[in-house]
C-alpha cells in the first residue's frame, strides 16, 4: 500500500502546527510520498507556499482544510467540531475557498461552517469524518459537551447515532465520504473510535481513510509544538516548562511524520482502501 498523508498541519495552523510548507514537503519526499494534503485549522493561507514547495520537490499537492463546524450559524458561541475536507479537482478547490470565505464572514474568532454550507459547496470535495474532536467522534467517546457513554445501552445508542450521521454524509457526498481512522495506539479514545469506525465500515460499506494528523515534520520538533501550545489559551496557567511538557508531550514516534508509516493497526484488521482510501490521489 502506498501511503499518502491526508491530514497535515504546518505553521499556518496557528499555535498548533510547526514547520513551513517547504519543510513538510521535503520530509514527505524523504519518506517516499508521491502526494501530500495540507489541512490547516480553519484557513488555506498556506496554499500558495504549499503549491510552490510541492512543485519544487516534485510531489502532488492536495489542498484541504480541517474545518471548524457547528450545527447552525445562529449562535457564534456554540461548540465547534472538526471536519477534514479535501479538494479533488478545480471545482473542489473553488468550493473549498468559498467555504473558507463564508466561514470567516459568518463567525467571530473561529471561522465556522455548518453542514448545510459543506453540502451546498460539496461539488469536487472529499469529506473525512475528522479527528477525535469531530462531532461523530465526540458522540462515541464524549467531549465538547457530549457525556462519556458509560453503560452498554449508552454506548450502543451513541454508535447508532454515529451510524445515522455517517450514512447521511455518505448519501449527500455520493461516494466521497470516508471514516477517518488515526494511528495513535497510545490514546484510548482513538482506539475506541477506530474500532467503532471499522465496524461501521464493515456494516455500511462506507470506506475508511487512514491519516496521521501530522503537526510537525520531524520527531525532534515535538518540543516546539509543546511551546506553541503553551502560548495559546490551552497553556493558560501552566507556569513551567515541565508542566507544559507533562501535559502536551505525546509519544513522539506516533505524533510526527514517521520514519515508517504503519497504518495496519488503525482499523483493527479491516481493510482501508488502496492509497488510504481515496482513489485518484
What is each model feature region?
Residues 266-272:
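Short, small-residue-biased leader/transition segments that mark boundaries at the very start
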Residues 1-263, 274, 278-281:
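Phosphodiester-processing cores and adjacent nucleic acid-binding clamps
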Amino acid at each position: 500500500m502506498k501511503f499518502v498523508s491526508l491530514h497535515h498541519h504546518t505553521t499556518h495552523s496557528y499555535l498548533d502546527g510547526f514547520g513551513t510548507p517547504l519543510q513538510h514537503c521535503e520530509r514527505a519526499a524523504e519518506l517516499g510520498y508521491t502526494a501530500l494534503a495540507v489541512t490547516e485549522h480553519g484557513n488555506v493561507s498556506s496554499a500558495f507556499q504549499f503549491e510552490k514547495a510541492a512543485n519544487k520537490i516534485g510531489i502532488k499537492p492536495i489542498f484541504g482544510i480541517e474545518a471548524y463546524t457547528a450545527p447552525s450559524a445562529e449562535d457564534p458561541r456554540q461548540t465547534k467540531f472538526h471536519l477534514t475536507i479535501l479538494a479533488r479537482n478545480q471545482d473542489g478547490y473553488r468550493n473549498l475557498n468559498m467555504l473558507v470565505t463564508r466561514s470567516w464572514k459568518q463567525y467571530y474568532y473561529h471561522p465556522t461552517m455548518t453542514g448545510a454550507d459543506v453540502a451546498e459547496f460539496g461539488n469536487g470535495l472529499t469529506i473525512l469524518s475528522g479527528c477525535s474532536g469531530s462531532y461523530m467522534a465526540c458522540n462515541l467517546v464524549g467531549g465538547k459537551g457530549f457525556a462519556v457513554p458509560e453503560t452498554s445501552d449508552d454506548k450502543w445508542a451513541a454508535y447508532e447515532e454515529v451510524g445515522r450521521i455517517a450514512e447521511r454524509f455518505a448519501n449527500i457526498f455520493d461516494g466521497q465520504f470516508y471514516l477517518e481512522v488515526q494511528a495513535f495506539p497510545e490514546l484510548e479514545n482513538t482506539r475506541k473510535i477506530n474500532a467503532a469506525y471499522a465496524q461501521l465500515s464493515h456494516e455500511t460499506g462506507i470506506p475508511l481513510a487512514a491519516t496521521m494528523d501530522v503537526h510537525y515534520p520531524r520527531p525532534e520538533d515535538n518540543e516546539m509544538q509543546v511551546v506553541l501550545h503553551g502560548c495559546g489559551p490551552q497553556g493558560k496557567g501552566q507556569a513551567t516548562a515541565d508542566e507544559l511538557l507533562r501535559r502536551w508531550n505525546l509519544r513522539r514516534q506516533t505524533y510526527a511524520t514517521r520514519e515508517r508509516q504503519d497504518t495496519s493497526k488503525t482499523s483493527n484488521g479491516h481493510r482501508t482502501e488502496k492509497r488510504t482510501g481515496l482513489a485518484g490521489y
